[in-house]
Amino acid sequence: MNWASAVIVVFGHRSQFLGIFGGMGASSWLYFTPFSQSEQAALDCLREAVFARDAEYYGEEGVESLAALVESGWLEEDPAHSVLDVERIVRCEPDMEGPGDVRVLEGPEVVDLFGTAQPSRDIVQQAVKRAGDGWFPPFGRGSGCCTAVYGGDGRPEELCFWGTTGD
């Protein structure tokens, strides 16, 4: 995985996508969104923004909304290699998330993975580079993780979503 070739696209005023796209096989992706108490609401907004970015592509195929894309079954047959491939926030034990799930990392797991209970954006970006190496989640294709990202004042500023999807 070559995280050094990240692509940055800005959505709205603060959401960012840093993505890695491989040719064949799975792709890893990483997004930062403004912090929200509701991870599901943040994920839903992020997915809508990514769909809007790619709307011309899907529109050429007659798909005019994210809901229509999900209903069409398109993503099961031809994954988007992005956050469009996941849809629900879950809280479960590590490695128990299923396809389409984004598992929230909290508490001791955050400390274990990031070395601090309040990881900054830089810490998260560096740590997530290890995703898919067999010990950093998510462990399977078709799922993701998220965690709060903290500013210098110790308050959460962003949510980070990352995962591995594709064929």
Regions from the language model: what does each represent?
Residues 126-167:
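Acidic, proline/glycine-rich low-complexity IDRs
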Residues 8-11, 17-139:
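N-terminal domain-onset segments
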Residues 6-10, 18-27, 145, 149, ...:
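Proteins with a high burden of low-complexity, intrinsically disordered sequence enriched in S/T/G/P/A and R
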